[in-house]
Amino acid sequence: MLDLSVIIVTRNTCQLTCAAIESVLSGQDSPSREIILVDNGSTDETPAVVAKRYPSVRQFRSERNLGFARANNLAARAAQGQFLLLLNSDAALQPESLAAAVAWMRAHPDCGAAGVQLLNPDGSPQNSIANFPTLATELLNKSLLRRLCPRRYPGKEHRFTEPVEVETVVGAFMIIRRDLWDAIGGLDERYFFFLEETDFCLQTRRLGKRLMHLPQITVWHGQGQTAKKDSPAARIEYWRSRYIYFAKNHRLSVRLTLAIGLLLRLSANCLASGLLAALTLGRSARWKNKWQVNSALGLWHLRGKPQDMGLPR
């Protein structure tokens, strides 16, 4: 059995995907590993370029977008590694990242999965951990929560220097024990994009396994460059995933409170952003974009949350 299976899901991100693959192949003291790429219906040159440049990469091609969870599950079924690494196509490893992550997991068998410190292209830290979604995190301002209660809601302002147990990690780089993956059954395919790794972290904790943040390992991350191509669609997809997460993991009273609170806030945001966009005569890109996002979310709710709105399938 190989030490590690690196799984990358891509869609129309040829240059980013090649950079991610290059970073895996150029690792120092790398464990035995394989790279599995799932192409989620790319219409650019990604499949052909990867096949030509990296013949050792095992590639699965889909004619349509399977979603993040389903694509990773497809690759995992073919994976031969003792550990699985979910790596975003807009992430790039440091030379020592793979060796350090595998070594840490081997030395700590009580750890089921782990994430690392993600960095922006300029080297500044990204939020690499998060809390499980609750009424507080979803209805209140997250930045304010992090400032008022930094221990309860740590963010990128809190720089950890030692490995620490956390609730969830950002799935741009997430190393997972294969036996844990099999016990949970992989990622829940009801999530098309967003929160699938958060739900996996919750199931990890429920099985009594620790989930760790490893700040000593750093990875470059574009922070959702693929999703940013269609902001209203991405926000709709996030809201859909949030409803799925709460329906699966919270009681009815919490779900109702969430829905009422979100709709009240959305109504206020629609009114405010529409008014400010009008007052600036549409010249403010910020308020124009906010109005487009909020109105799209409002229309999605009015139409009954249809599947044909959101990220393309």
Question: For the regions a protein language model found, what residue spans apply to each?
Answer:
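Active-site-adjacent helix/loop segment of glycosyltransferases
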Residues: 7, 206-282
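Short, flexible, basic/aromatic active-site loop/helix in glycosyltransferases
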Residues: 133-167
